[in-house]
Structure formats: structure tokens, C-alpha cells
Amino acid sequence: LMASNAYYNDALEKAGVRDLSGAIESLKISLRFNKLNIDARNLLGLIYYEMGEVVTALTEWVISKNYQPKDNLASRYLDEVQKNQVRLDSVNQTIKKYNQALLYCKQNSRDLAIIQLKKVLSLNPKLVSGHQLLALLYIQEGRYDLAKKSLRNAGKIDANNTVTLRYLKEANAA
């Protein structure tokens, strides 16, 4: 239990300086030590939500609520998301458009993928993975300034994301 709480506290510190990826790792370790650490699970959901990963956030909150049905902040988080139909519709559109962008990437249609990702990010501007994929496509196209802009946007959400930092290093080296 002490180890779980220590990793939870570490995650709080990391989240406080927008190291969301680092906070996620600490929270996952915390939950390995104690899967019933409701505060850790709820914070993990909040961080996923902040990173635009709404479905993953909802999953964590549902698990949390199953472990502790009463007096659980997850109930409030779930209610707030579920009663906002516009937000739920936006999440569904984001998922569809992001998956379409991935399909375009697999088909080597980078221009269509870029257009689709711009739509995704207009619906969900905090989707770190969307900014990263857009930047990767820009790097492949040799459009390094646009890649850096997209990566800076991702960095504002999650300051120490290793994928973002690796892509930024690549874009700066070009």
C-alpha cells in the first residue's frame, strides 16, 4: 500500500508540471501495487481525459466505480461526460476521423491523412497522438516548420512525452 501511495504522489507531482506521460507511468505502477487505489485510478482517468483520450478515461472511471460504487469522484466524472451529448458526439467523430487518417497513412495517402488529422484536432485539440501523427506526416513531407508547430502543441499538453521529444529532435535535425 505504501508503494502504491508513493507512486500516486509521484504522479501528482509529475501531473503538476504537465509531465502527463510520466504521471501515467507512475499511476500504472501504483495500480500494480494496489488495484484498489481509487484516487490513482481516478487521476489516471483525468490525465487520459486531459490528453484527449476520452474513451480510455471513461474506462478507468468505470473500473474505479466498480471497485468503489459509493463516495467516488468517478461517478461525477462519468455523469459530466455522459450528460454532455455534444462532447460524446465529438468523441465519436474524433475516433472515426482518426481511424480514417490511419487508413490513409497505410494507403500512403499522406495529403488525405493530413486533412483528416486537421479535422480530428479541430474536434479534439488536446489529442496528443493526433498532434504526433500530424507532425510525423509533416516530417515525411519535409515540412519541418509545420511539424515543429504540431509538436509544440503536443508539448503544451504533455511536456515530457518521449515520442513528442523524439520527433522534435528529428524535425530540428533536418
Question: How does the language model describe each region?
Answer:
Residues 16-17, 50, 67, 80-87, ...:
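Register position in tetratricopeptide repeats
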Residues 1-6, 81-96:
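TPR-adjacent "capping" and linker segments in tetratricopeptide-repeat scaffold/adaptor proteins
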Residues 28-32, 63-66, 121-122, 153-156, ...:
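Conserved structural position within tetratricopeptide repeats
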Residues 4-5, 38-39, 72-73, 94, ...:
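Helix-start (N-cap) detector for alpha-helical repeat units in TPR-like alpha-solenoids
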